[in-house]
């Protein structure tokens, strides 16, 4: 059985520079924030970070201390599912059948018994309702 919850993912943008990733992650560590998932890339001279943590408020406070960049949050759905083949396919099919578009997805797992799928859709409320079927 899947556990489906509404969460927030941190969106942070700052001018690209050497050491930006180190500064971001050190601030999070100093605040005691655990990074559960991260996507970072450069776009037109800007470092873009999407950070999924165990403490969105603490992460926001930590990144505000950098004194640079733009900080925001994105509502996401977190689905904790068994770490078995086909789980992402099942999630994707449920959403497609409900006519819900997935606009962003990332997943994390290890040898643990569960995996976490984090996604944003064009209708998170309906998506959560649909995913409760899993």
Q: Where do the PLM segments sit?
A:
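A conserved regulatory-domain signal marking ACT and ACT-like small-molecule sensing domains
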Residues: 1-134
């Amino acid at each position: 059985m899947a556990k489906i919850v509404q969460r927030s993912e941190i969106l942070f943008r700052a001018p690209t520079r050497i050491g930006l990733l180190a500064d971001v992650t050190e601030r999070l560590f100093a605040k005691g924030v655990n990074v559960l998932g991260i996507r970072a890339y450069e776009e037109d001279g800007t470092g873009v970070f999407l950070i999924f943590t165990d403490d969105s408020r603490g992460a926001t406070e930590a990144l505000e201390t950098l004194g640079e960049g733009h900080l925001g949050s994105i509502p996401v759905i977190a689905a904790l599912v068994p770490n078995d083949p086909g789980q992402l396919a099942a999630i994707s099919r449920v959403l497609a059948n409900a006519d819900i578009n997935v606009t962003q997805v990332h997943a994390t797992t290890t040898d643990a018994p569960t995996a976490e799928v984090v996604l944003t859709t064009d209708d998170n409320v309906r998506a959560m309702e649909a995913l409760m079927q899993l």
